[in-house]
Curated annotation (Swiss-Prot):
Primary localization: cytoplasm
Compartments (UniProt record): Cytoplasm
Name by which UniProt lists this protein: Phosphoserine aminotransferase
Function, as annotated: Catalyzes the reversible conversion of 3-phosphohydroxypyruvate to phosphoserine and of 3-hydroxy-2-oxo-4-phosphonooxybutanoate to phosphohydroxythreonine.
S-S bonds: none
CDD domains the UniProt entry points to: PSAT_like
Obligatory cofactor(s): pyridoxal 5'-phosphate
Biochemical pathway: Amino-acid biosynthesis; L-serine biosynthesis; L-serine from 3-phospho-D-glycerate: step 2/3; Cofactor biosynthesis; pyridoxine 5'-phosphate biosynthesis; pyridoxine 5'-phosphate from D-erythrose 4-phosphate: step 3/5
Binding site for L-glutamate: R41
Organism: Burkholderia cenocepacia (strain ATCC BAA-245 / DSM 16553 / LMG 16656 / NCTC 13227 / J2315 / CF5610) (Burkholderia cepacia (strain J2315))
Amino acid sequence: MRVFNFSAGPAAMPEEVLRQAADEMLDWHGSGMSVMEMSHRGKEFMSIHEAALTDLRDLLGVPASHRILFLQGGGIAENAIVPMNLLGARNTADFVVTGSWSQKSFGEAKKFCTPHLAASGKTENGFTRAPTRAEWQLSDDPAYVHLCTNETIDGVETFEIPDLGDVPLVADVSSHILSRPMDVAKYGVLFGGAQKNIGMAGVTVVIVREDLLDRALSICPSAFEWKTIAANNSLYNTPPTYAIYIAGLVFQWLKRQGGLEAIEARNIEKSKLLYDTIDASSFYLNKVEPAARSRMNVPFFLADETRNEDFLAGAKARGLLQLKGHKSVGGMRASIYNAVPLEGVKALVEYMKDFEQRDA
């Protein structure tokens, strides 16, 4: 029996994708091979690779000025890879810290430069807001400005993206990429691990403006140098072939759903239902300012936290899994990525109401 999986990542996958992957496991399109067994330079995998790149470009509307790269290492590795590729002759990068992940990015950058804290969304209740552009205090000559546009742990999403002129904007989009349309031209770099909305863990997507490919530090390993990866069409070293294949199936699935406009409408409906339930209750609490609430990751707390384990046990009994909040903040967290259906959110809301009524 399939359950409703609210994991923050690795996360729920579209059932259609899982079934297609299962059907093709032993024999991909009459090749007699599993995708796992293919040479990454053979014609079979090359067709998978090129289709994935093309479909992602179509879905996001990536302009010709930007290259799409498939790398490894996840978002954590990109926290080091970004400064090694973008600092050039500069020694400062600016950071807008809106939660735990951008805080990690800020800390990692200290190994390569003197990072400048341009703005913070931290309040007495933790990270609960997204600073406006007017609050950003940029340094005089930063190599780039870093922003995590959706904080997976804290549930803070930044929707208003400013134009920074000549300063490249770098965005960690790991946990909301493909959940809504984006103006990719506004960004110098977008990066994200796949294991939330793109597919399975193992591949990292980087979208970089082509004119930024000549800034790498001499210490940057060639396997992580974007210019080298771009020149070799993401095949400089053996790529995570099966993860790219799964990502390609997800891209095709998204197209069949009507693209990102249709997906965004679904995600708005799902998140509104859950937030409305929380706000109407005196038993559940979300601390994030409404304008900055994530559509993908919804943290909430029980008024009586001694009931946390009872809540989780009851949810599991109903087939509602992976609702425990991150250890750094506690409480609960429902990650409602693209693959989580509206029926799953309705089932969660029904359970939350039943649990509150029973507790009362």
